[in-house]
Amino acid sequence: AKRGVMLLLENHWGLTTTAANMIRIIETVNSPWLRAILDMGNFYFEEDMYAAVQTIAPYVDLAHAKTYPGGGLVYTLDLDYARIFKILLDTGFSGYVSLEMEGHEDPETAVPKSMAMLREAWQTAQE
């Protein structure tokens, strides 16, 4: 806190597999310097991943938009990015969204393709 450094907790595995666990950690620490990173592909084990996004959204300062061009390396999800972006925007999200490309396709083609798809989803979410 003295240095103005924000610590962001990512939903990944173990303790941060669920939105409820992430919120429990953030609220227990109870510091304005601890917030969340939303990895859009990592609420895979939640019963309703969009409900999980809705639950954690007020705590999110950064989001990873995970894409899977050419099929995923470990798994592939068909994510509704516009729906996720809308949830974030409706809760006042003003942070950054980064691309996390995990597909088999060559990054030379996959990254521009993913960016175009995400930009379109962002526009749709703002309508």
Question: Model regions: which residues?
Answer:
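Histidine-acidic metal/acid-base catalytic patches
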Residues: 16-127
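Short catalytic-loop micro-motif centered on adjacent basic/acidic residues
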Residues: 7-11, 37-39
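An active-site-proximal structural segment forming one wall of the substrate-binding cleft
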Residues: 1-3
